[in-house]
UniProtKB/Swiss-Prot annotation:
Species for this entry: Streptococcus pyogenes serotype M6 (strain ATCC BAA-946 / MGAS10394)
UniProt cross-references to InterPro entries, sorted A to Z: Asp23
Name of the molecule in the record: Uncharacterized protein Spy1535
Similarity remark: Belongs to the asp23 family.
Domain of life: Bacteria
Amino acid sequence: MTTEYIGEIVISPRVLEVITGIATTQVEGVHSLHNKKMADSFNKASLGKGVYLQTEEDGSVTADIYVYLQYGVKVPTVSMNIQKTVKSAVYDMAEVPISAVNIHVEGIVAEKTPKPDLKSLFDEDFLDD
C-alpha cells in the first residue's frame, strides 16, 4: 500500500503546550502548573503557564514543566509519572517525539489548598463546557 502525498500537516506549538499541560495536571500528585518567566536567550517558547517547549534540529521537542505537587507525595515518583504521561500523550495525539521532559518542582502545596480551574491555565474556548 502506498501513501499518496496530499499536503502538509502543521501542528502549532500551542497545541503541544496544551496537550502537555493537560497531561501534566492529570497525573496523580500534581497540584498545578507554575508560570515561570524564562529568558528568551534559552531559545524556548514561553507560550503558556508552566510549560516551555523547545524544538530541536531533528524535529523532536524538549519540554520544561514547572509544577506544584501535593503534600505527602513521593516527588521522584510523581516526576517520573509526569515524564511518561507527557511523552505518551504528545506522541499519541500529535505524533511528535519528546526527547526530554524536564520537571521543575516549584513547591509543595498543603492538602486543603483548592486546585486551580483548568480554564485558568489556558485561554482556550474548547475547555468551556
